Curated annotation (Swiss-Prot):
Expression is highest in liver, with lesser amounts in the lung, spleen, brain, heart, kidney and testis. This is E3 ubiquitin-protein ligase RNF130. InterPro entries: PA_dom_sf, PA_domain, RING_finger_E3_ligase, Znf_RING, Znf_RING/FYVE/PHD. Pathway: Protein modification; protein ubiquitination. It comes from the Eukaryota. Induction: Up-regulated in response to interleukin-3 (IL-3) withdrawal-induced apoptosis of 32Dcl3 cells (derived from bone marrow). It comes from Mus musculus. The keyword Transcription does not apply. A zinc finger (RING-type) spans 264-305. Glycans are attached at residues 29, 40, 112, 135, 172, 189. Residues 28-194 are extracellular. The lineage of its organism: Eukaryota, Metazoa, Chordata, Craniata, Vertebrata.
Length: 419
């Protein structure tokens, strides 16, 4: 099998890991710690003796904001050319600050420009803090990023609470706000449960894959060693058998020189005077130079398939092979009855001590005409082995990729945003 064919599945596994590594997660942004903000809101409605108070526990300080307490009156931007301005992104954004107010807090809606622009514009008008409410009702506050905004405090709250406060401001009702530092939340790259899940799953997957590969290669090594030993012993047995066969030189008047006599079945040529021939136990005659190499590999008569090892009593009932390095699939084609007979003969032999191939599921050696596996068949067998190994690698890579994506999915609640 070519190196390119073996590298194909391996490249797929590498591509899967590369895709996983480039998966768009928020792990880099989510590694920052953040502080929660505890916000108390006091609403002084006209004609009502007791002010209305409520608390916002889900506020969050900006990443670049000072983590400090602040108190002030809440103000929203003035309309621009008669159009309400809740975003604070327009260069003409203005705030009406009553003369008797020393500290005030700007209330702005998220969107349309960066947090830095909103906060800087409010700071330009001397706000001590900026409260930005989300622009999506189902989203929790995020950690805002706004470098270079100075000492102004920036906090984000939910859309629901922000619009509640805005509704009072639109009615010209005074709203006071106190912002206090809440809990420091450490970086959260992986939830504990996700980390345990990824670790255990990956370890189990690697153990199973490694055990399978180790078992596979051990069996392959055992098979190869047994095959080589049997091949050497078969070769020795064939040489011993050949040495016991009768040879003679064809002389004038011998029956082999008769034109009607069979030609040599190996080279398909007639016998001539002074040719050295080999006589097999089945009485078939061949050129010695032709049949000896054949017998070394096949150990059977080229014509009647007689087993010369068995006929000479060297290895009784031993099936011969022209190539012991056969592929596994061709071995499984013959019947189980012949396999048991062949392996029984191998185990019962005492002259050479040949051992059967220690590979489960191997059937007997096929007939000589089918023994030599074609190049395409060998390539298919080897390709299948590499495909199985590469499949385990690809499966491991995809599983690990899935587990990492699943674990990082819990990071959304800790994201850092710029606008």
């Amino acid at each position: 099998m070519s190196g390119a064919a073996r590298a194909g599945p391996a490249r797929l596994a590498a591509l899967a890991l590369l895709t996983c590594s480039l998966w768009p997660t928020r792990a880099d942004n989510a590694s920052q710690e953040y502080y929660t903000a505890l916000i108390n809101v006091t609403v002084q409605e006209p004609g009502r003796g007791t002010p209305l108070t409520f608390r916002i526990d889900r506020g969050r300080y900006g990443l670049d904001s000072p983590k400090a307490e602040v108190r002030g009156q809440v103000l929203a931007p003035l309309p621009i050319h008669g159009v309400a301005d809740h975003l604070g992104c327009d260069p003409q954004t203005r705030f009406f600050v009553p003369p008797n107010i020393k500290q005030w807090i700007a209330l702005l809606q998220r969107g349309n420009c960066t947090f830095k622009e909103k906060i800087s514009r409010a700071a330009f008008h001397n706000a001590v803090a900026v409260v930005i409410y989300n622009n999506k009702s189902k989203e929790e506050p995020v950690t805002m990023t706004h470098p270079g905004t100075g000492d102004i405090i920036a906090v984000m709250i939910t859309e629901l609470r922000g619009k509640d406060i805005l509704s009072y401001l639109e009615k010209n009702i005074s709203v006071q706000m106190t912002i206090a530092v809440g809990t420091r939340m450490p970086p959260k790259n992986f939830s504990r449960g996700s980390l345990v899940f990824v670790s255990i799953s990956f370890i189990v997957l690697m153990i199973i894959s490694s055990a399978w590969l180790i078992f596979y290669f051990i069996q392959k090594i055992r098979y190869t060693n047994a095959r080589d030993r049997n091949q050497r012993r078969l070769g020795d047995a064939a040489k011993k058998a050949i040495s016991k066969l009768t040879t003679r030189t064809v002389k004038k008047g011998d029956k082999e020189t008769d034109p009607d006599f069979d030609h040599c079945a190996v080279c398909i040529e007639s016998y001539k005077q002074n040719d050295v021939v080999r006589v097999l136990p089945c009485k078939h005659v061949f050129h010695k130079s032709c049949v000896d190499p054949w017998l070394s590999e096949h150990c059977t008569c080229p014509m009647c398939k007689l087993n010369i090892l068995k006929a000479l009593g060297i290895v009784p009932n031993l099936p011969c092979t022209d190539n012991v390095a056969f592929d596994m699939e061709r071995l499984t084609r013959t019947q189980a009855v012949n396999r048991r007979a062949a392996l029984g003969d191998l185990a019962g032999d005492s002259s050479l001590g040949l051992e059967p191939l220690r590979t489960s599921g191997i059937s007997p050696l096929p007939q000589d005409g089918e023994l030599t596996p074609r190049t395409g068949e060998i390539n298919i067998a080897v390709t299948k082995e590499w495909f199985i190994i590469a499949s385990f690698g690809l499966l491991s890579a995809l599983t690990l990729c899935y587990m990492i994506i699943r674990a990082t999915a819990s990071l959304n609640a800790n994201e850092v945003e710029w606008f």
